[in-house]
A protein has these predicted regions:
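Conserved N-terminal/central alpha/beta ligand/cofactor-binding core
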Residues: 1-37, 286, 290, 297, ...
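Short glycine-enriched, charge-decorated loop/helix-capping segments at active-site entrances
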Residues: 3-7, 81-83, 138, 210-212
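Generic secondary-structure signature for well-ordered alpha-helical cores
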Residues: 24-28, 80, 84, 98, ...
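C-terminal helical "tail/cap" subdomain of flavin- and related membrane-associated enzymes
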Residues: 226-312
């Protein structure tokens, strides 16, 4: 069997819990605590202030704060680094369905007129369930007269999908969220702090995927934090190593994905690539390899790539 598993589709609540259990096994944790403010001493960050689930105010002191608190990061807001501008943000809506026909072990990305520019995803989630949703730029969403929910309904009721959703039922209310894209190199560190994941705006502009870059950020942040603990240096200069390591690894791909996002806005170019892929297995493998990170995405923005497609 030459089929190789490139990844897994797993609900966030399950995967997040898996990660939390791993963390809880090696450190002290506190659940139900909401950070409200940063604590400063001598103009430097010295901890956080917040509330427990019982409503009790508490302060935790630390020589460094690592903000992994998502797209609506309180840490980034309090530092004045929160960015959710129209140009560098996408919006998405997701819903789990049961009874969707034609599911396989393959993820599906559909570039359809109802979501142009943007795409509709359909991911198998096991036990006859599917994770479906749409994503598009905040700029494009603002120009829409339709809500994201209306667009999603239009897609599943369209001629192309209506048979697959004939007996399908939503398992929840659709959930929407903002996606801070890694189209620009945002400030992610300073004296006594580092920002990771969505809090640092690391989402891939082309695919909308963020967990991979967030985990890369976690790897380098822990490396630098460990070094700082040994040296006692928690300065912006010391933490600049985190930024350098992170962007040396993901910067080129994020820049390429930004170019690809712009290219995908061209219906002519998108249809050209997809039509060639439909007729040519080699082109299919090239595109699949790029989506699964087996082939560098920068090849997709190279003129040589289109030469290959044209003559494959």
């Amino acid at each position: 069997n030459q089929h190789i598993t490139k990844g897994f589709v797993i609900p966030r609540e399950i995967f997040d819990n898996y990660l939390f259990e791993k963390a809880a096994a090696v450190t002290e944790t506190l659940q139900g605590f909401s950070v409200k403010e940063l604590v400063y001493e001598n103009s430097r960050i010295a901890g956080v202030k917040g509330e427990t689930k019982e409503g009790q105010e508490e302060i935790f002191k630390a020589p460094m704060i690592i903000g992994c608190d998502g797209a609506n990061s309180i840490v980034a807001r309090k530092l004045g680094l929160y960015e959710m501008d129209m140009e560098n943000t996408a919006v998405a809506i997701r819903c789990y369905y049961s009874g969707v026909e034609g599911l396989t072990d393959q993820i599906e990305l559909h570039y359809v007129k109802e979501v142009n520019p943007g795409y509709f995803w359909l991911f198998p989630a096991g036990e006859g369930k599917a994770n479906i949703g749409i994503g598009l730029s905040k700029n494009d969403a603002k120009k829409e007269s339709r809500t994201l929910r209306q667009i999603l309904d239009e897609v599943i009721q369209s001629d192309y999908f209506k048979d697959r959703f004939m007996n399908a039922k939503p398992m929840e209310k659709p959930v929407g969220w903002n996606l801070p894209l890694g189209k620009s190199h945002r400030k992610n560190h300073g004296d006594g702090y580092m920002l990771l994941g969505d809090a640092a705006g690391l989402i891939d502009p082309f695919t909308g995927e963020g967990i991979g870059n967030a985990m890369v950020a976690g790897k380098y942040a822990m490396q630098v934090a460990s070094e700082s603990k040994n040296t006692g240096d928690y300065s912006e200069k010391a933490f600049s190593k985190y930024d350098q390591l992170l962007w040396d690894e993901i910067g080129k791909e994020l820049r390429t994905s930004t170019k690809l996002q712009n290219l995908a806005r061209s219906n002519f170019l998108l249809n050209f690539i997809i039509n060639r892929a439909a007729r040519n297995e080699e082109v299919q493998e090239i595109i699949s390899g790029m989506l699964s990170n087996e082939i560098p995405k920068d090849e997709l923005s190279s003129p040589l790539f289109y030469f290959k497609i044209l003559f494959s």
